[in-house]
Regions:
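Intrinsically disordered, low-complexity N-terminal extensions of AAA+/P-loop NTPases
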Residues: 1-157
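Conserved catalytic/switch belt of AAA+ P-loop NTPases
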Residues: 302-352
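C-terminal alpha-helical "lid" subdomain
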Residues: 373, 377-439
Length: 439
């Protein structure tokens, strides 16, 4: 195995925490015959332990060795893989180097650990090659990655030669991409040890779809039209969804990533205190073959906050052209985002040499940077009842509409007033009562 791994070209720089290189070193020690049996066995168990951990995180099953090799191929963000993401393989000499590496991976797929197991009297490699995973709830592992990697693993098992192996891997790169950006829908921003912002995958995103959002058809239509244009590579605008709380603004944004993920849409959630990191985040993603929505939930600024200046600078752009694969989508309960005071409206007085009306204009100009503004208003009483009845049907609650509406009326009087959120909370309550009564 060590000889095989040492001959890799394109996939030579594997992730620092990979298991392939340590296992190759173990096999080299064994082949040389210069090893301590107990120490070598302990090293093997350490790598198998790591493999089991990875299998648990991603819900791998059956042949964990094959699953891991497939996972390694879709995780390596080398230049070849990145050029293939969302477009597939292009003609070029690099393909010959890729096929050279894939021939090696094909040999790794069929690598025989039996001699090692017999000599050390272990059976861990046999077990991981015919593994039966414990059935887990979806929230316990990343189902999105699990299904895709296991499907690729199965396809690679059936590849007859390096050409078929090449076709399987590059098709995966075309369909989904490579690395964490290819395998995950959404990300948050964290600070890496070096102080630079790092994109961290959100493994369990809310599985909401537009059919779950009752009402607001015009709003959803405008949002979808803008997003479809963006995903298709046409001109599109930054979007601001504003209006009353609990009306489905955030849910509408979340539904977008579930609808357009397979078409290359990715979402990055960012908070106000991270706005100063926006330039560095954009630098990390601007040359990737995906469409990115930078998502800001419940966006608003108080009079003393200046983070909006970072946001304006990013939206307006400086000397560098704003990347066409990035848009900003925000939700807010405020139409103008920034708290406006009567003091800002005073056109006569000056403060530190600046007219206060200029201050007001600077604050209010931020909303104008969003080319698409969509209002989500509080539903009427009739619309509220419709939402309640539709949600009840979706949950399988067989209750009379008149009864539902009467109870929904009582509920909203004590739980924040009329809104889609209030309706959902009411249905959750009824569902909980119904489930309890069945016990």
């Amino acid at each position: 195995m060590h000889k095989l791994v040492s001959q890799l070209v394109i996939y030579r720089n594997l992730p620092a925490d990979n298991l392939l290189e340590p296992l190759a070193e173990i096999c080299a020690e064994f082949s040389a015959g210069d090893y301590n049996r107990e120490d070598l066995t302990a090293e093997i168990y350490e790598q198998v332990h790591k493999l089991l951990d990875i299998g648990t995180v991603y819900g791998f099953d059956k042949n964990l060795w094959h699953n891991y090799l497939a996972f390694l191929l879709v995780s390596c963000e080398n230049p070849f893989a990145i050029t293939c993401e969302k477009v597939g393989a292009c003609d070029g000499s690099v393909n010959q180097f890729a096929k050279h590496d894939f021939k090696i991976f094909q040999q790794l797929f069929t690598y025989d650990f039996s001699e090692l197991e017999r000599a050390l009297e272990i059976n861990c490699f046999s077990l991981i090659s015919n593994y039966q995973a414990v059935v887990k709830q979806e929230r316990r592992y990343n189902k999105n990655i699990s299904e895709k990697v296991q499907a690729l693993s199965t396809a690679l098992e059936g590849a007859a030669d390096a050409d078929e192996f090449f076709a399987c891997v590059t098709k995966f790169y075309h369909d989904y991409g490579v690395g964490k950006l290819g395998l995950n829908k959404a990300f948050r921003i964290a600070q890496a040890q070096q102080g630079e912002p790092e994109l961290v995958p959100i493994s369990n995103t809310e599985q909401i779809i537009f059919a779950d959002l009752i009402g607001y058809e015009d709003q959803k239509k405008r949002l979808l039209e803008n997003t479809e244009a963006f995903v298709a590579g046409r001109s599109a605008n930054n979007v601001l969804l504003f209006g009353d709380s609990g009306t489905g603004k955030s849910s509408s944004i979340k539904a977008l990533i579930n609808k357009y993920y397979d078409q290359g849409l990715r979402m990055i959630e960012i908070y106000k205190h991270q706005f100063r990191d926006l330039s560095q985040v954009i630098a990390q993603i601007k040359n990737r073959n995906y469409r990115f929505i930078i998502y800001m939930d419940d966006l608003s600024f108080e009079e003393f906050e200046i983070e909006y200046k970072y946001l304006k600078a990013i939206i307006e752009g400086g000397l560098e052209v704003r990347p066409d694969n990035i848009l900003i989508y925000a939700t807010s309960n405020r139409r103008h985002l920034i708290n406006e005071t009567w003091k800002d409206r005073n056109d006569v007085t000056q403060e530190d040499g600046i007219y206060k009306s200029d201050t007001m204009q600077e604050k209010l100009s931020l909303v104008n940077r969003f080319g698409c503004t969509i209002y989500y208003g509080q539903p009427t009483q009739k619309e509220y009842y419709k939402i309640v009845c539709e949600l009840a049907k979706k949950q399988g609650l067989e209750l009379d509409d008149d009864f539902l509406c009467a109870e929904a009326r009582k509920w909203e009087l004590h739980h924040g007033g009329i809104s889609g959120r209030t309706a959902q909370q009411f249905i959750n309550y009824l569902q909980g009562v119904a489930d309890f009564s069945k016990k």
